[in-house]
């Protein structure tokens, strides 16, 4: 398996937190909003997965990544988010696109579907896992759910990033740290350092 790295400069409580965020904020009122997520789209295209590859966007929120992928004729785009509110909005927004992907309303650490994936995209979840047991469980889930020769595209805050995001503590990574976390089953193909510009900048 391979992975790309994008480096940016309690279950019930987590669910309540994210439901509140997506109930009270406009879609463009969060710092991670991107109408067209160019970096993610580029990395997915570079992976050269087929248009019918099983793709999942982990911690999708109300992201427009799925809209852009469906416009590009990817046909099996699944979403995972702890917020049912966010998933409902995205489902409504993309209902006119042909898509055989599944919308999973789950905490990532409880995620255990029958499906497996050719490409796993996460620019929103992993850095919120701050405890060793959570991180190890996430890695095990990736190892189980990503197909052999599949791709893991993961974005985290770099060592120069903030201490918190959306009011929650996060864990920051260097490329070497991230490489080590996933080293048992994944091989680093490439990494990027991105200065994320928020909608408020």
Show the residue positions of the predicted features:
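Conserved acidic residues
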Residues: 118
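Class I (Rossmann-like) S-adenosyl-L-methionine-dependent methyltransferase catalytic domain
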Residues: 1-115, 129-141, 151-201
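Short, conserved loop/helix-junction motifs that constitute active-site signature segments
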Residues: 144-147
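A conserved beta-strand element that flanks and buttresses the S-adenosyl-L-methionine
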Residues: 121
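Short catalytic micro-motifs in class I SAM-dependent methyltransferases
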Residues: 124-128
């Amino acid at each position: 398996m391979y992975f790309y790295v994008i480096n940016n400069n309690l279950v019930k409580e987590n669910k309540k937190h994210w439901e509140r965020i997506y109930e009270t904020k406009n879609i463009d009122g969060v710092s991670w909003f991107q109408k067209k997520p160019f970096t993610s789209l580029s990395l997915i295209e570079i992976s050269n997965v087929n248009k019918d590859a099983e793709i999942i966007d982990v911690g999708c929120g109300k992201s427009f990544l799925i809209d852009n992928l469906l416009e590009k004729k990817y046909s099996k785009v699944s979403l995972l988010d702890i917020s049912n509110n966010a998933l409902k909005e995205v489902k409504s927004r993309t209902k006119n696109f042909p898509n055989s992907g599944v919308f999973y309303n789950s905490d990532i650490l409880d995620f255990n579907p029958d499906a497996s994936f050719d490409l796993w995209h996460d620019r929103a979840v992993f850095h919120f896992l701050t405890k060793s047991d959570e991180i190890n469980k996430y890695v095990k889930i990736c190892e189980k759910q990503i197909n052999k020769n599949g791709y893991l595209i993961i974005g985290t805050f770099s060592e120069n990033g903030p201490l918190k995001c959306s009011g929650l503590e996060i864990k920051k990574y260097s490329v070497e740290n991230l490489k080590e976390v996933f080293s048992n089953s994944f091989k680093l193909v490439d990494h990027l350092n991105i200065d994320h510009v928020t909608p408020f900048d």
